[in-house]
From Swiss-Prot:
With S4 and S5 plays an important role in translational accuracy. Part of the 30S ribosomal subunit. Contacts proteins S8 and S17. May interact with IF1 in the 30S initiation complex. Belongs to the universal ribosomal protein uS12 family. The modification 3-methylthioaspartic acid is found at residue 89. InterPro entries: NA-bd_OB-fold (IPR012340), Ribosomal_uS12 (IPR006032), Ribosomal_uS12_bac (IPR005679). GO terms for molecular function: rRNA binding; structural constituent of ribosome; tRNA binding. PROSITE patterns: RIBOSOMAL_S12. One of its GO terms (cellular component) is small ribosomal subunit. This is Small ribosomal subunit protein uS12. It comes from Cupriavidus pinatubonensis (strain JMP 134 / LMG 1197) (Cupriavidus necator (strain JMP 134)). SUPFAM superfamilies: Nucleic acid-binding proteins. Keywords: Methylation, Ribonucleoprotein, Ribosomal protein, RNA-binding, rRNA-binding, tRNA-binding.
Length: 125
């Protein structure tokens, strides 16, 4: 326990909390325009072609974000909505693109976890 004198000389410093998604600037989502849509490979031990997009946000940030789900209709100049959330096996990917919002369609024929992929409720047969 420090003495009062020690605290006067060197006060307590509170820890600075660093944001995990700085480009959002404390907003829940941000809109942006795709500048490049491509696939990339995950780090070991996984193997796949993960779909990602480079997005220029309305606040000027340029970020790499992940396109979840099977199949997508994104291309250059598509307007998308991004949210926070990293992809553990893709270094540098700290954002997700929201499915079923703006130019990105929801996942077709999705039956479970539909809200996460922007899929409408299927018609009862």
């Amino acid at each position: 326990m420090p003495t009062i004198n020690q605290l006067v000389r060197k006060p307590r410093v509170s820890e600075v909390i660093k944001s995990k998604s700085p480009a959002l600037e404390n907003c829940p989502q941000r809109r942006g325009v795709c500048t490049r849509v491509y696939t990339t490979t995950p780090k070991k031990p996984n193997s796949a072609l993960r779909k990602v997009a480079k997005v220029r946000l309305t606040n000027g940030f340029e970020v790499i974000s992940y396109i979840g789900g099977e199949g997508h209709n994104l291309q250059e100049h598509s307007v998308v909505l991004i949210r926070g959330g990293r992809v553990k096996d893709l270094p540098g990917v700290r954002y997700h693109i929201v499915r079923g919002s703006l130019d990105l369609q929801g996942v077709k024929d999705r039956k479970q976890a539909r809200s996460k992929y922007g899929a409408k409720r299927p018609k009862a047969a």
